[in-house]
């Protein structure tokens, strides 16, 4: 697992680093501020970024929003000093996949990161599938609109209009949506 650690160098982060290395995890980068956290996530797209909530330049909440919006890390896990219901609600809202509290325990850290990676992977797969379905739906809307135009202007049946779009698509080696957009724009 590829991990980025973002936060101040403390005994806790050093212990975490030691535990992760003992388990064979690859610590891709260690950074001390929010700006660098985003920068290294963009470069390395880690499985997990383990981040303190309060880090310089951009706080963990802002960093998590950006990471999740840009999909540049599999999961965000926060390192928290202690339990605070308000903070937990905030980090849930920005898409964090977990949090680790003091005192630091090796098994707790490893299991939290493993679950975070797993749920992050599932989330990415579902999001990819959702995006694909949305794209197909949008394609279908444009193609249906183009079919309607062809049916009206050329007095074709729906099947004939679809076949015409498909034929042009194959001849020009472009997607049916591109042909459909051309038909819609040129009408």
Residue ranges and their predicted role:
Residues 32-48:
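Acidic, metal-coordinating helix/loop segments flanking the phosphotransfer/catalytic sites
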Residues 131-187:
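C-terminal output/effector regions of signal-responsive regulators
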Residues 52-53:
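Active-site residues of response regulator receiver
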Residues 104-113:
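C-terminal output helix
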Residues 33, 59-62:
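Acidic catalytic/metal-coordinating carboxylates
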Residues 7-29:
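Two-component/phosphorelay signaling modules centered on CheY-like receiver
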Residues 61-72:
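Short amphipathic alpha-helix used as the core "switch/output" element in two-component signaling
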Residues 46, 60, 91-97:
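As written
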